[in-house]
Every structure is written in structure tokens, then in C-alpha cells.
Amino acid sequence: MNMFASGTAALPLRASGVVVAPTVLAGGALSRVDQLKAQIRNPGEASFFYRDHHFQYDAVKVLPGEYFVSAEDLVIMTVLGSCISACIWDGRVRAGGMNHFMLPDGDSVDGFGRYGSYAMELLINELLKKGARRESMQAKVFGGAAVMAGFTTMNVGERNTKFVLDYLATERIPVVSQDVLDIHPRKVCFFPVTGKVLVKRLAHSHPETLAVEERKGNAATVAKATSGGSVDLF
């Protein structure tokens, strides 16, 4: 909904139905978050903008099937289980982007951004529009965790991880960092201007998987999975 339409401005609604007024700064200017919210977005482009008070940054959350590319000083964030996010950055133009796909490929016309084959092509093409070049791009890859015990014979996280690494190798985009597989969900925070990524491993929320590890006698894995989680810089 465009809150700048002529006539009486319509205010955006939260899911709860509560009206959310835009933040007006001194002098009557809208905050950058509200300016970002007001911009027209492409299909599949992330549009959940907010102020991250931990980093003191404007932020955008990338949901499954979405992507976001920017040369602005903000943070692009997502949370991953078996899904994969590729963070691709071109230091020459100081621009980067992130996607979030659920499966390597599929034949559904709905939610095509959920499939890696399309999500990777879309991310790279949007970076090229920002002036990036393939020969200058580098990638950091995250996710692919085995968070569901039912996928032991055909692990989705492993398939996603193999797909994205093979894809980037074919495209000759070097993977300079990765934090993949394992059993931990991850919160990924990507800074597209600098190319830096902060990853927090989250406490495991699937006790059935922990039970499997306990039966295997993997005490160290169980202890790690139930702890608060660590934060790493990539």
C-alpha cells in the first residue's frame, strides 16, 4: 500500500491490524526505513525493513524465496535451517546481495525464488545491474543444516550445500568463506558495503534430532546444540 498516494495518506498495517505510523524525523523528513518501505520492489525482493537496535543499523529481513541487493550501508539479515543463503559481494563497487533458497531446483511456477537454480541467477543478475562484474565477485555461503531428523536418507541441507558450491564453481565465483551443514540453525547478518558477515548459531529447536545424536553417543554434539550458540565473523 502506497502511503504517499494523493488524498488522505493510508498508514501501513501490522499483521495484528494495528496502524503503524511512519517515523518522522526533525524537519518533517521520513526515516530511511520508511523511505525504503515506500519504494516499489521487484517480485521476490525482500521488503521487510526495520531498525536493528543491536547493530544500530537499518536492516532488511530476507524470507525464504526472497533476495536483496544493495550498495547502501545497511544490514541484510536472514535465519536459516536447511536452507542456503549465498552472500555475494563485489568490493570494486562496494555492493552485495543475499538470497535464501529452500531446494536446489523444482518445477513449480509459484515461489520460484525458493529454488537455488533461479535464486542464484537472480542474485547475480541484480548485482550486475548495480555495476558489479562476475570477475570481481566473491561469495560467502551459509546454511544447509540437518535440522530435521526425517531427512536422513536424502538430507535437504546437504543437497542445497552441494548445489550452491557446484553452481559457484561453474560460474567461477570464488567461495572465500562458508559455514554450512552441522545441525544448528543460523542467524546471518550481511553488510553489503563491506562484505562482512556475522553468523550466530542458534540453539537447536528440534529435540527429535538431539535424540538421534544422544542414541549415537555424540555427547559433545548434544551439549553444543543445546548451548546458547556462538557468533563468528566471516
Swiss-Prot record:
<dbReference type="GO" id="GO:0006935">
    <property type="term" value="P:chemotaxis"/>
</dbReference>
<dbReference type="GO" id="GO:0050568">
    <property type="term" value="F:protein-glutamine glutaminase activity"/>
</dbReference>
<keyword id="KW-0378">Hydrolase</keyword>
<dbReference type="InterPro" id="IPR038592">
    <property type="entry name" value="CheD-like_sf"/>
</dbReference>
<comment type="similarity">
    <text>Belongs to the CheD family.</text>
</comment>
<dbReference type="InterPro" id="IPR005659">
    <property type="entry name" value="Chemorcpt_Glu_NH3ase_CheD"/>
</dbReference>
<keyword id="KW-0145">Chemotaxis</keyword>
<comment type="function">
    <text>Probably deamidates glutamine residues to glutamate on methyl-accepting chemotaxis receptors (MCPs), playing an important role in chemotaxis.</text>
</comment>
<dbReference type="InterPro" id="IPR011324">
    <property type="entry name" value="Cytotoxic_necrot_fac-like_cat"/>
</dbReference>
<protein>
    <recommendedName>
        <fullName>Probable chemoreceptor glutamine deamidase CheD 1</fullName>
        <ecNumber>3.5.1.44</ecNumber>
    </recommendedName>
</protein>
<dbReference type="Pfam" id="PF03975">
    <property type="entry name" value="CheD"/>
</dbReference>
